[in-house]
Structure formats: C-alpha cells, structure tokens
Design a protein with these regions (language model features):
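Terminal targeting signals and extreme-terminal segments of soluble enzymes
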Residues: 1-103
C-alpha cells in the first residue's frame, strides 16, 4: 500500500473517548481548511461505530456550519436517537474549539 493511500485511510481512524464520543487529531497538510468530504466520512464512521454491524446506511443528511481547522482536534459526538427493529437513527456533531462545525 502506498503512502498516499495509507494517509487517506488514516483520516478515518477515530479514537473512542467514551461510548458515544470520538476524536480525531489532525496534522496540517498545507490546506487552510479541512475538506468537507473528510468531515462527512468521519461523522459516518463515528455513527457507524455505535450501531449493530449488520446495519447499513440508508440516509445521510448534513450541514456544514463552520470551516474546520487541520491544526485543531475534532470531537465527534454521537446522539443515539432511536434503535428500532428496522432502522437505527443517529445524529453526529463534529466539534472544534467547543463549537459545532458539522452536523
């Protein structure tokens, strides 16, 4: 596996802090802001870590609230809204400096 692929996959390695709390420590790669697709994917990973592995993503809605900064840790807070027989619902908020940057 080449370094670019390893670095890209490393973006999705979140650290579990608590049952519904994850973090990611970034490092500057020369961009001013974090790419929105990265935050979306990381939120998806955080939410997926809180559901049964047999569950698949059915729907994903998101809001970009503020620009993300590579030099700041991101906290992913998962809200377990519903665990039903057919569907599981999660809300994931990405937070930097105490403010939501993505939901």
């Amino acid at each position: 596996m080449n370094n670019a692929l390893k670095n890209t996959l490393g973006l999705f390695n979140l650290n579990r802090i608590d049952r519904d709390l994850f973090s990611w420590t970034g490092e500057s790669v020369g961009f001013q802001r974090i790419f929105g697709g990265q935050i979306m994917a990381q939120c998806l990973v955080a939410g997926y870590e809180t559901v049964e592995k047999a569950r698949m993503v059915h729907s994903f809605h998101s809001y970009f609230l503020r620009p993300g900064d590579f030099d700041q840790d991101i906290i992913f807070e998962v809200d377990r809204i519903r665990d039903g027989k057919s569907f599981t619902t999660r809300r994931v908020t990405a937070i930097q400096n105490g403010e939501a940057i993505f939901s």
